[in-house]
């Protein structure tokens, strides 16, 4: 951006806004200090102080910008629309007279900043974008509308083209940043979409679907502060690496109260320590498990096999088989959840035993005397045991007999055997997997809380739920999320073309079938790829044409850039040749990205070898499985890289990725679409067929033309 004649005046306005922001922060800190000093008083006074303290703390959190810029632009309305000027920023700021200096980007008046186009200027005469670093104004970009409109050239259809490109070319930090200054029209439509119902956002790589969903959460909290602040907003991600990657976005937008979680976090009674084979994960995720678990719970409600004769004084109190069956039948009919019926069963057992006495006896007093008797304990354990979800699954999966009893009518015996695992000595010793989590949740829905157990809380529900990478979730995982929706309001985000794992879906209809249907689902699609350079997307599109031929690749904003590099390794060189090629490629990419980051994306089977090769070469790096991308160089298994963005990527062994992953071509497509700048492929021998150029191009020898992959000398 060249020097703009209004640069000094706009810098002065920005300085004034920051001064007012500092004044507001100082005022809030003084008020907080006064509240902290206050002690004693009535209960009402203490309550009021707590409310004030929470309110002030929330406001202080909003006023903390860190390194983020306060302002990023302004809009000037046409004289016929008032001729007003509004400065758009991260949060609302007023001067000492309460005159607005900055309008919150989520306010309705700010909408034209993101949505106005030449065809629909929305009453604007001019839109001005600021390029800033902190509080310093570096440049100004103007867009004129109406009779003053200019030809925008290559940026047509994009708001703030220069600012957008500058933001896209900024080096990655290992954390996802907000896009509040460069939100585009199609993104803003999704962000401001109404709260009720389910909104499905389909978006290819680099379209910004994740960050759009997070900005939508911030927008909904601003627009519907009451009731969402009390009801809560939940963001669910595919893994902890992904959560670490996105965790700073909402706080940077002044919304620190949103809960970020993986599915396992929603069940806090167990820890995930194992992984299921694909065929086991497929079965555990199938909706048929609803019937298996419901039958497993029903199977634990059984009449006595023989009459109970309980010694009591000089007589035996009797509960016969028929009476026990009546009690179980009545309890099944009366109670929706299993554990809720236990008290009724106890009372009925006490009543029948008391009625069998030759002398009158109070059932309540009798129960107090006999409830711990081993024969009574055994009878109740048979008729109606108190169960936790973990106990139910521990017993079920540890017994082939119980599995067949619960599932024989809906699951084949061969598949039931997949669920069996050796019984642990204790439920605390069970190695739970990610795919057990929705089954534990389903079991809790069937069992309910245990009486007088405070740790058995009711399922927490939320006023809005954002689900990222939803295309990979199983029916049982989706049921788990639906159970946490208070009112059916959800934002479901993903890309069918990137659907991988045991439950990869081929359409959003398959996903929506398991989510709340109080209102018809709305669908939006992001079609523009902002992050991935055109040459990288062109290579990835070859894979897409085979893995999901009905889907189109996003249209890349940046058509320039270095073509992907293909680093061929002689098959005779083996793993050592791969290691040398990876080290050479990483060094080349580090030289090209400066302070940016580099990720080596590989099959999980190569993770340790590649890390050892980098260590031997003296390249400091991290291995991202659970932790984030703090290192400049990181080795990431292909199954964990979805949703991340890096400056440069080295994709190792594309053939191995295709062969090892459940949806190999889709996994390779994910791997090829992570780089915002440079992409290198390290491969043994010939490239997989999916990466070969079309036959016509191969015959014409066009594979090495500009915009096509660059071949690197063979290694080995």
Language model feature labels by segment:
Residues 184, 188, 192-195, 218, ...:
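Amphipathic, well-packed alpha-helical segments that form the structural scaffold of globular domains
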Residues 175, 179, 209-213, 289, ...:
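Phosphate/oxyanion-binding active-site loops and adjacent basic polyanion-contact surfaces
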Residues 94, 221-465, 472-480, 488-489, ...:
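Alpha-helical nucleic-acid-binding subdomain
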Residues 1-180, 184-189, 702, 706-716:
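Extended, charged low-complexity regulatory segments
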Residues 74, 139, 391, 492, ...:
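A structural signal for short, well-ordered beta-strand segments and their strand-loop junctions
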Residues 2-24, 65-68, 133, 150-152, ...:
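P-loop NTPase Walker
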Residues 163-170, 424-425, 520-522:
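Short glycine/proline-rich turn/loop motifs
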Residues 226, 230-231, 240-266, 271-281, ...:
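Conserved helicase motor core of SF1/SF2 NTP-dependent helicases
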